[in-house]
Amino acid sequence: MNKGNLIENYAVALFNNAMVDNIQDKIFEEITSINRIITDNFDIREFLFSPIVNKNDKINAVNSLAKNIKISTIVQNFLLLLVKNSRIAILSNIVDAYNTLLYESKNIKIVQVISANKLQPKEQEWIKSRIEKELNQKTEILFDIDNTIIGGIVIKYDSMLQDYSIKGSLEKITKALKTVNIAV
């Protein structure tokens, strides 16, 4: 089984479990919080990800963490399953996949917008409204910065890529010039 399918399977299992009690949002908050704790704390991350540390010690650590931050039994059992199956290292990927499932269940499309500089709130709202109008669907926009695109924006969703960047335009021009045998 490839890693993508594995991640998706874990996310779907957790999501389906949360749906039983209609607590998908609560579970997302909890799993995101746990993931942030693990990601932000080097010692916890190294302890849980280490192949040398005994699984029982990891299980005790997860149980202690769950008790201290008061997470649901569903999330605690899910984390224990990941530890027992030596899959805790893919938790961040599972959280991302779960997030996608959560938005899909609400008919909200996740769209990534990349710009060369930080966009102003008015610009973000304008872009969001244009994308929602084009897709005829509510969106959750993730704004990222990549100064290598020079200017403009790149829009990604599903398997679509819309490149309105200066870098993308220059690459298209370069490719076109190469096809007509003009040295670049």
UniProtKB/Swiss-Prot annotation:
Compartments annotated for it: namely: Cell inner membrane
Question: Mind telling me which GO cellular component terms the entry cites?
Answer: plasma membrane; proton-transporting ATP synthase complex
The record's keywords, sorted A to Z, are:
ATP synthesis, Cell inner membrane, Cell membrane, CF(1), Hydrogen ion transport, Ion transport, Membrane, Transport
Q: Which Gene3D superfamilies match?
A: N-terminal domain of the delta subunit of the F1F0-ATP synthase (1.10.520.20)
Query: How does the protein associate with the membrane?
Result: Peripheral membrane protein
Q: Where does the UniProt annotation place the signal sequence?
A: none
Which InterPro entries does the UniProt entry name for this protein? ATP_synth_OSCP/delta_N_sf, ATPase_OSCP/dsu
Q: Which SUPFAM superfamilies does the entry mention?
A: N-terminal domain of the delta subunit of the F1F0-ATP synthase
What would be an example GO MF term here? Answer: proton-transporting ATP synthase activity, rotational mechanism
Role description:
F(1)F(0) ATP synthase produces ATP from ADP in the presence of a proton or sodium gradient. F-type ATPases consist of two structural domains, F(1) containing the extramembraneous catalytic core and F(0) containing the membrane proton channel, linked together by a central stalk and a peripheral stalk. During catalysis, ATP synthesis in the catalytic domain of F(1) is coupled via a rotary mechanism of the central stalk subunits to proton translocation.
Stated family? Belongs to the ATPase delta chain family.
Q: Assembly state and interactors?
A: F-type ATPases have 2 components, F(1) - the catalytic core - and F(0) - the membrane proton channel. F(1) has five subunits: alpha(3), beta(3), gamma(1), delta(1), epsilon(1). F(0) has three main subunits: a(1), b(2) and c(10-14). The alpha and beta chains form an alternating ring which encloses part of the gamma chain. F(1) is attached to F(0) by a central stalk formed by the gamma and epsilon chains, while a peripheral stalk is formed by the delta and b chains.
Task: From the Swiss-Prot or TrEMBL record, give the protein name.
Answer: ATP synthase subunit delta
Question: What species is given as this protein's source?
Answer: Rickettsia peacockii (strain Rustic)
Q: Which gene encodes it?
A: atpH
